[in-house]
Amino acid sequence: MKFRLRKPLAILSCAAAGVITLSACNFGSTLLGKPQKVVPASHGELIADEFVAFTQKEETFAAKLAACTYENYDGGENFTVSPISVYTALSLAAECAAGDTRDEILSALSVTHTELKKNISTLYRSLANDVRDGLTLLDMTNSIWVDESTQVNKSCIDALSNDYYCYSYSANFKKDNAAANGAVRRFVKDRTRGLIDKEYGLSDETAFAIINTLYLKDLWNLTGNDLPFTDEEYGFNNADGSVTQTKLLTGYYNGGKVYETDEYSAFYTKTLGSYKLKFILPNDGYTVDDIFTAENIATVNGLTDYGNSAPESGTYYATRCFFPEFKCGYDGDLAGILKEKFGIERLFKNPANESGACDFFTLTSSPAYCTAVYHTTELAVDKKGIEGAAGTIMPGGDGAPQPTEKYDFVIDRAFGFIITDSRDITLFSGVVNKI
């Protein structure tokens, strides 16, 4: 039995690489609205106490999402999610929702609606359209796709455009489903520069879909030269007990020493654009499953002092990472995790047959609910740089030369990682189980 008005909402959250200029009309869809011009966030906005507190809450969400998703991941393969992509898609959903549905989403994000409205623009502008010297690129795109039969409130569309930098499209999911799905597929492929190209199969009952895409690409150095490999091969201990003989990439020195705990050790390398690749390496007697927890992820990403120097001796410390090339990905539905671990339940309840059902009346008077939260990622780290994220540059001393102690941090077993921007906003987080 079908309910014409009780149409499901599909939230599509994607993370990976690519951006192509969006045309005003896409085959299978019509542009209803476009975001206001993006003005880069100012230094004052980025260091404001309220925004710093907001990003701390976002990073708590990021650590929990990465850990919970990995806990439910049974593929045994390399794994990564993009917490900022999921966070942004849920923020768009919160703006479209009302009542208890909105409250549940905001509770999962640990913010009030006022906090979200006041800070999401700064967060977006700190990430979107970050292009440096034509070599570094970080791009985020928000969009909402509305079925032609769905009546929407213009005030909500305007808020999405102005506060969330969101494109709005009309597509005929009901009467020309193939064309509508084709438009969504091309949009995601274009915005991710071909890294994500899949058929999502949004049904003819789709009232609207919320889509976030993220693309990051950076090099290790200004000249674009490859990172050198080690002269010798290392035995990389895969999570399944096998060993792969491989040469490791030799990262540049960064100030500080390896952060060590009883369970794991951590350090980072950087890209040309100051994106950071942070490694979480299990110590002997522990596995990556043991140490890739929300608490440990948050601790490592919150580190600001790696002990760069010893003032009493004037000694400067520097460490470089030896690490393998790797690829990671994810393709799944996060709805179950969001319900079980984050308490977002009403969003997924059908108004046709469930009490306490989804309320999207800020966007539309038609009853609607969410059927899935599709999340797809692709990430590659190699000798050229990162498509997804990366890190670079060694801090220099000030004044007279200082004695320097140099260390090597060898990543020779299955490990966890975090990829962030220069302000430690998590773009990707995951686990490399094997190479």
Named regions from a protein language model:
Residues 2-9:
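Bacterial Sec-dependent N-terminal signal peptides
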Residues 9-13, 17, 24-173:
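Detector for small/aliphatic-rich hydrophobic stretches
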Residues 12, 25, 34-39, 371-378, ...:
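Non-catalytic interaction/Regulatory regions outside core domains
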Residues 62-63, 78-102, 268, 403-435:
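Feature captures eukaryotic membrane-trafficking machinery centered on endolysosomal pathways
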Residues 76, 115-283, 306-402:
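Non-catalytic, conformational "gating/processing" segments within enzyme and secreted inhibitor domains
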Residues 105-109, 224-234, 290-298:
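Short Gly/aromatic-enriched secondary-structure transition segments
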Residues 286-287, 426:
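Short beta-strands and strand-coil junctions in structured, solvent-facing domains, enriched
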Residues 300-303:
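Soluble, non-membrane globular domain cores that form compact, hydrophobic packing
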